[in-house]
Swiss-Prot record:
This is 33 kDa chaperonin. The gene is hslO. Its main location: cytoplasm. The keyword Membrane does not apply. NCBIfam families: PRK00114.1. InterPro entries: Heat_shock_Hsp33, Heat_shock_Hsp33_C, Heat_shock_Hsp33_N, Hsp33_helix_hairpin_bin_dom_sf. Coiled coil: none annotated.
Length: 297
């Protein structure tokens, strides 16, 4: 069992189907350590972390991928970001009194919308939206790919507060199998086998054992794992830029309202950035991010 977070790609040698497995423990623990989430919220957030990791392993881009779910229900917001450098962070907002033990996606995020955003460093920003109408986040993501007429893609996701795991299957353009009926039958066969996967197996088995148990009659080629890690992209410079964007008059007014100390908290990691009168003055005197001030988690 690996001691780092990773995704791992695999191929079915005789078909036009690829797969990806995601395993997050350290980064999942980092996300949960920042906020005290109830178990159902932590589970959904873990599934979204695994989904983002799978998508970054599947989609080719240089920039940032954002998965965001919004709802008027007990969980108004789930949000995960994963960069092409394979750095992940996530957050949830919830109404504690409305979160029932054992509740699933339908109960926690009724009438919800799931947004997938790819924000490349160069080129056009892409955004797709799908209703959260499935029984699970995996169902919703699979439905998104079906509705958007992309390559047939299926997801299996589970998380238990300690480990977040995901499996993805994707049908590639015709190469090895040219016959349309044969391609369809092969795809349905592989998906049907994956549908037998239990949460206990996905969360408890290593990748080699899992694939052998599912596809012992198939020729599966497993590639080297690629690491993932938790990292928040917040910084003192970004916080200073946000204050600068207010304009000098508004920033100084905010400073007076806050008794001489403006505090900017990162919603993802709880890092605190403090700006006093000297810092604010330097912001508007070309001083960049201001003089050093105390920061804390």
């Amino acid at each position: 069992m690996s001691d780092f977070d990773f995704t791992q790609r695999f191929l079915f040698d005789d078909t036009d189907v690829r797969g990806e497995l995601a395993d997050l423990r350290g980064s999942y623990a980092e996300v949960l350590a920042k906020h005290p989430y109830p178990e159902p919220v932590a589970q959904l957030l873990g599934e979204m972390l695994a989904a983002a990791a799978l998508l970054v392993g599947t989609l080719k881009f240089d920039g940032l991928l954002v998965l965001q779910a919004r709802s008027p229900g007990p969980i108004p917001l789930l949000m995960v970001e994963c960069s092409s450098e394979r750095e992940v962070r996530g957050i949830a907002r919830y109404h504690a009194e409305q979160v029932e033990p054992g509740a699933g996606l339908r109960e926690l995020m009724p009438e919800g919308l799931l947004t997938l955003t790819i924000d490349p460093r160069r080129g056009q920003r892409y955004q797709g939206i799908v209703e959260l109408r499935g029984e699970s986040l995996a169902d919703c993501l699979s439905g998104y790919f079906a509705d958007s007429e992309q390559l047939p893609t299926r997801f299996w996701l589970n998380a238990d507060g300690r480990r977040a795991r995901g499996l993805l299957l994707q049908q590639l353009p015709a190469d090895r199998l040219k016959d349309a009926e044969a391609r369809t039958l092969n795809w349905e066969h592989l998906v049907t086998l994956a549908d037998t996967l239990t949460a206990e197996e996905l969360l408890g088995l290593d990748n080699e054992t899992l694939l052998r148990r599912l596809y012992h009659q198939e020729a599966v080629r497993l590639f080297e794992p690629l690491p993932l890690r938790f990292r928040c992209s917040c910084s003192r410079e970004r916080s200073a830029n946000a204050l600068s964007s207010l304009g000098q008059a508004d920033a100084e007014q905010l400073l007076r309202e806050r008794d001489g100390l403006v505090v900017v908290d990162c919603q993802f990691c709880n890092q605190r950035y403090e700006f006093d009168a000297t810092d604010i003055a330097q912001l508007f005197a070309g001083g960049g991010s201001g003089a050093p001030s105390a920061t804390r988690h």
